[in-house]
Amino acid sequence: MKRLTCFFICFFLSEVSGFEIPINGLSEFVDYEDLVELAPGKFQLVAENRRYQRSLPGESEEMMEEVDQVTLYSYKVQSTITSRMATTMIQSKVVNNSPQPQNVVFDVQIPKGAFISNFSMTVDGKTFRSSIKEKTVGRALYAQARAKGKTAGLVRSSALDMENFRTEVNVLPGAKVQFELHYQEVKWRKLGSYEHRIYLQPGRLAKHLEVDVWVIEPQGLRFLHVPDTFEGHFDGVPVISKGQQKAHVSFKPTVAQQRICPNCRETAVDGELVVLYDVKREEKAGELEVFNGYFVHFFAPDNLDPIPKNILFVIDVSGSMWGVKMKQTVEAMKTILDDLRAEDHFSVIDFNQNIRTWRNDLISATKTQVADAKRYIEKIQPSGGTNINEALLRAIFILNEANNLGLLDPNSVSLIILVSDGDPTVGELKLSKIQKNVKENIQDNISLFSLGMGFDVDYDFLKRLSNENHGIAQRIYGNQDTSSQLKKFYNQVSTPLLRNVQFNYPHTSVTDVTQNNFHNYFGGSEIVVAGKFDPAKLDQIESVITATSANTQLVLETLAQMDDLQDFLSKDKHADPDFTRKLWAYLTINQLLAERSLAPTAAAKRRITRSILQMSLDHHIVTPLTSLVIENEAGDERMLADAPPQDPSCCSGALYYGSKVVPDSTPSWANPSPTPVISMLAQGSQVLESTPPPHVMRVENDPHFIIYLPKSQKNICFNIDSEPGKILNLVSDPESGIVVNGQLVGAKKPNNGKLSTYFGKLGFYFQSEDIKIEISTETITLSHGSSTFSLSWSDTAQVTNQRVQISVKKEKVVTITLDKEMSFSVLLHRVWKKHPVNVDFLGIYIPPTNKFSPKAHGLIGQFMQEPKIHIFNERPGKDPEKPEASMEVKGQKLIITRGLQKDYRTDLVFGTDVTCWFVHNSGKGFIDGHYKDYFVPQLYSFLKRP
């Protein structure tokens, strides 16, 4: 049966010597009005064990009816999600208002992979509490004092992504029972959102039915949605209150609303309450949250170009796949093939006792080839046995050969997706040998994903097979929904965005870090890393992430302070201040369980087992190695709930099974290279321990150009007064293929009759690399051919693409280097958002040591070939603090004024005063021609010289 009833009441005259507590009358929390509301027209209050009469019109005999045997007085669910860590409590209160003993069943569905942390039960005032014990200890305790008339246990359900916790208690007339179960789980991001499911199946009407879900996310909520999962019956019942970082979902139907029809006694509450949400992401380096000696790092970058993939579909077409399973698989594969991108390469292998391939090598996913592959799949006729070993080795051979021959894009990712519904029956039958063969032949750049269809397949084998080869396994339930399950899984891995993702926390006081090295990152998902630290030794935690995108090597940095969350969590009574510890424990235990299944020796397995057991006991959670012992205060009545055999792969619901690397093993290419302008440090570090070069050519403010002439050792300044929207060429070097242009933005309004202009956007074009970089006051975007990569000013990161490297320091500076011989620095100037006049703007700094060609020109580029100047006849000016002088340059004699300008490289707020000689009239006479000669039509246009 697909959905089980949460409360099943079976009535029989029991002669079992159970745990019976005689009381008189009904429980104090059930009154006559409650019963009338739950079953109108059915009840009259009578003494215990008596009957009541009701005369029916036209009938002389009496009809005797009994009071409803069991009343569900209260059914409450409270669930709190704090930074993806969900803690849920399910509580029900039941009263036996029958004159006979009744068996009361508490049967609730919880997500697979959730850890039960507590269970308690009160039977007419006598409380049973739970404790976590090692399985053998728990069974021994249970054997000593078995509770009569009571059972408890965890049951693996055949339904999708759920299991059942079931307790059965025999209670006497009038007795009340309260059940309360607590469990915890991590919310994994899939296809762009987190999904929180609460299974509501009370089985009958409840006087008080209340569900409350609190979502608390420090990152901020991007959206929150409660879909209709009850076919419109409870339209308008869920109430959603959403703020910037917190939301509350309330579901409290009245008894009348619960009824499946106006006069029915059956409940319509039979299904799932689902909450979908996602969080805001401002930083590419993710969200690093630190609290109470633990940290959690959430990483889910977007706005990245997909990495091309080489994908082999290996499909079981043995006789056991006949019928619905094959039909659904074919339907799913047709959709999946249509979703392949033009830059992808693919092939299809189908196998029974024989191995067939649609193509013996990888083929581009053109429309023609996809159509041909779909026709091939449609003709498949399942029959015969199952030769998994040869099928996987054939797939591995195709990918290995293509890679060895250089046929694969070096920036692509390679995937094998195996779909099978049974164990091998032909060829190699020993599962450990198949696992060994795959491991010995597969190259390290290949990820193997296994989809086990139905329950005849050895799912534990598929888990080991995939976890050992950079993938995961997932069970596909063989029913009418098989096609959508297959398509949903493919969608999760269809968009690889990063390769070789590694998290580093460079400090010795950071310990016990969970898996921090991942083969791939797929769009719409999220990687989560957690660890411990010593608060006495650290007041902040630094993270450095290295990864490779479609065409770029990345270094992403972030920093978190110890007290960042203290104020936020203290202001919300529902926030879980222990979420970092729980999340770390959840990840660690799940990863240890996966490692245990792959342990190469018995000694290693025993060591891992001891670690899992100790953590299970320390954190009070039920795992496959522990039992839930439920006992009364006297200790003479006990129940036992064992977890079922482990079914989910690592971190149930997670898309990644990674590995661990030492904390300081950052790739050599990730170490930021020194630049001649500014040292790129982590956010929060002190800026510029070493002094930047004192002399650069720069543009700041309105826009003020400061040109340093090394031979003369003079700074010459000029302004450009132009219109917003105009694009000025700063450097144009057609021989080197380098362009630097700047687009002007205007102030909000004129000041003293003059509208100031600033650089609001800068464009850099490196022609030989086909790389364009656009820097605005909001984003930094790198384009290479048809691919793009964006960062925001809130990131601290380093991006390397061929000869070009971009370093971003959060809210301060972007440094661009070319072959480590040429550099440009762009400073960000933020102003108060409500300032009546000023706007955010950019400043650019270019060292005169940059090796441009002699043909370089532009407002700055022309001075790479230093002109001769002669400054003489210095004299007092109209302003006593600004003397005047004459300057001969380029055959012209100019009147110049000495003053001060600002260099903001070492002090972004106040700047450092720099003495310079100012050329009036927009640099006329000092620059070649007129400033309007330097207008260009596009942000990446070369300057056309007359």
Swiss-Prot record:
Coiled coil: none annotated. Belongs to the ITIH family. It is found in: Secreted. The gene is ITIH2. Glycans are attached at residues 118, 445, 666, 673, 675, 691. It comes from Homo sapiens (Human). GO terms for cellular component: blood microparticle; collagen-containing extracellular matrix; endoplasmic reticulum lumen; extracellular exosome; extracellular region. Residues 56-185 form the VIT domain. Residues 308-468 form the VWFA domain. The modification 4-carboxyglutamate is found at residues 282-283. One of its GO terms (molecular function) is hyaluronic acid binding. The keyword Signal applies. SUPFAM superfamilies: vWA-like (SSF53300). I-alpha-I plasma protease inhibitors are assembled from one or two heavy chains (HC) and one light chain, bikunin. Inter-alpha-inhibitor (I-alpha-I) is composed of ITIH1/HC1, ITIH2/HC2 and bikunin. Residues 1-18 form the signal peptide. The modification Aspartate 1-(chondroitin 4-sulfate)-ester is found at residue 702. May act as a carrier of hyaluronan in serum or as a binding protein between hyaluronan and other matrix protein, including those on cell surfaces in tissues to regulate the localization, synthesis and degradation of hyaluronan which are essential to cells undergoing biological processes. Disulfide bonds join 261-264, 650-651. One of its GO terms (biological process) is hyaluronan metabolic process. This is Inter-alpha-trypsin inhibitor heavy chain H2.
